[in-house]
């Protein structure tokens, strides 16, 4: 543990907690502060000037990261007939209907994402207590309830990430791995921020993006220059 603490301290000393970093420098620091032997995930913590207690200020969405998430996504799809065939041809790992629901009720959870056609939501809805707590319930707002399965499957396989503002007005979203080149991390992060700026509720008052911090799984937080972000996404 002392060795771990020493490595974290050395990483943290590279970061000036009082400074807001330009994106290029922030992405470079993210890589420098990744100290674990495994390939750490890089996350953004985005503090928004919204009150999620009001339904019209719930910020949520999804974005296909230009450089993916650096991992293979196992995808399950609820569909029948021609739509089941469409999902299989697009690259879905598991495709089913009532049979898949029975497997999930029996404890099968060998997938990372779940998509369904609208007509299958009656079946999927019965799995709410299993899927909901795991964040796997399909939702039309993020494109996981759809008739366009070919597109949905390809997007998920390419590295589509979903986000939703939490109670404190914070969005947590992963955007790559510490092994990524800084330019790829920057492109993925910029794609997320583009969607978040566009998702600003009309009823939100004052400053919308109040703080942005980047970090690896076990690394220190790195604050981002908000003026640069605002200029890029004006």
From Swiss-Prot:
Alphabetized PROSITE patterns for the sequence: RIBOSOMAL_L1
Keyword list (alphabetical) reads:
Repressor, Ribonucleoprotein, Ribosomal protein, RNA-binding, rRNA-binding, Translation regulation, tRNA-binding
- Please name the GO terms of the biological process aspect recorded for this protein, alphabetically: regulation of translation; translation
| Domain of life of the source | Bacteria
For the keyword Repressor, the answer is: yes
Q: Name one GO cellular component term.
A: cytosolic large ribosomal subunit
**MF annotations from Gene Ontology:** rRNA binding; structural constituent of ribosome; tRNA binding
Please give the Gene3D superfamilies that the UniProt record associates with this protein: 3.30.190.20, 3.40.50.790
Q: List, alphabetically, the CDD domains matched.
A: Ribosomal_L1
Per its UniProt record, what Pfam families does this chain match?
A: Ribosomal_L1 (PF00687)
Its family remark reads: Belongs to the universal ribosomal protein uL1 family.
Q: What subunit structure does UniProt give? A: Part of the 50S ribosomal subunit.
Q: PANTHER family this protein is in?
A: 54S RIBOSOMAL PROTEIN L1, MITOCHONDRIAL, LARGE RIBOSOMAL SUBUNIT PROTEIN UL1M
* HAMAP family reported for this sequence: Ribosomal_uL1_B
Q: What does this protein do?
A: Binds directly to 23S rRNA. The L1 stalk is quite mobile in the ribosome, and is involved in E site tRNA release.
| Name of the protein in its database record | Large ribosomal subunit protein uL1
Q: Which organism is it from?
A: Anaeromyxobacter sp. (strain K)
What is the organism lineage in this UniProt record? Bacteria, Pseudomonadati, Myxococcota, Myxococcia, Myxococcales
